[in-house]
């Protein structure tokens, strides 16, 4: 299963993440305590042996152009209402791999109806990967009944409030293509290797679970 460990800030965190994850991410141009500067991001991209996603809430193409050109990354994670025309421009101009976030409600009174609405929104986009999140890296879980329905139709990456204690059952239930974690593997606002190790072990247990 694809595992992305997001929100790194230092080379030390990068080295830990590289031992366990398939990809990582740096937070740029958005309101987050994990936000880092372009120079730091560029350094991490250059040091990395795994893909580094530039994560941002920007909807302006020029902001994404600055991110790409300064950091040198070819991987973008978009948490905004950016339109398909802008995405097409970025892909044609820079050839980037784009993961687009779609918001799932924390609780749903009608999971099937909510899932159909989100599926319709997803189908209006052409991107490389779909991320289902509770909302802009808030660190809260969402209604997995909704994401389970969507995961039956698309290869999705699941995010939102994941941690070593809940990820096994969530992976078993939703059956995503991949998962994305940040705050759930931190201790004192830094990536914790023991938490990451336990998280990844439980992801694999959930992935290999058979009814």
Curated annotation (Swiss-Prot):
Source lineage: Archaea, Methanobacteriati, Methanobacteriota, Methanomada group, Methanococci
UniProt protein name: N-(5'-phosphoribosyl)anthranilate isomerase
UniProt source species: Methanococcus maripaludis (strain DSM 14266 / JCM 13030 / NBRC 101832 / S2 / LL)
GO process annotations (BP): L-tryptophan biosynthetic process
InterPro entries cross-referenced by the UniProt entry: Aldolase_TIM, PRAI_dom, RibuloseP-bd_barrel, TrpF_fam
Pathway: Amino-acid biosynthesis; L-tryptophan biosynthesis; L-tryptophan from chorismate: step 3/5
Family: Belongs to the TrpF family.
Record-linked Pfam families: PRAI (PF00697)
UniProt entry tagged with the keyword Amino-acid biosynthesis: yes
Entry EC no(s): 5.3.1.24
MF-aspect GO terms: phosphoribosylanthranilate isomerase activity
Transmembrane segments: none
PANTHER family the UniProt entry points to: N-(5'-PHOSPHORIBOSYL)ANTHRANILATE ISOMERASE
Keyword line: Amino-acid biosynthesis, Aromatic amino acid biosynthesis, Isomerase, Tryptophan biosynthesis
Cell membrane as UniProt keyword: no
């Amino acid at each position: 299963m694809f595992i992305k460990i997001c929100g790194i800030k230092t080379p030390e965190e990068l080295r830990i993440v590289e031992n366990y994850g398939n990809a990582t991410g740096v937070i740029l141009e958005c309101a987050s305590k994990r936000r880092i500067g372009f120079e730091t991001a560029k350094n991490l991209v250059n040091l990395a042996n795994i893909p580094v996603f530039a994560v941002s809430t920007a909807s302006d193409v020029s902001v994404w152009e600055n991110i790409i050109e300064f950091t040198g990354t070819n991987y973008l994670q978009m948490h905004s209402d950016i339109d398909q025309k802008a995405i097409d421009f970025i892909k044609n101009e820079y050839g980037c791999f784009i993961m687009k976030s779609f918001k799932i409600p924390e609780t749903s009174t009608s999971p099937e109806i909510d899932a159909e609405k989100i599926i319709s929104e997803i189908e209006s986009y052409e991107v490389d990967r779909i991320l289902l999140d509770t909302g802009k890296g808030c660190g809260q879980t969402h209604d997995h009944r909704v994401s389970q329905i969507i995961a039956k139709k698309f290869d999705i990456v699941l995010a939102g409030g994941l941690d070593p204690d809940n990820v096994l059952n969530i992976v078993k239930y939703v059956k995503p293509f991949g998962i994305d974690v940040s705050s759930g593997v931190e201790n004192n606002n830094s990536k914790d290797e023991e938490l990451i190790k336990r998280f990844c072990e439980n992801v694999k247990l959930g992935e290999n679970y058979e009814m």
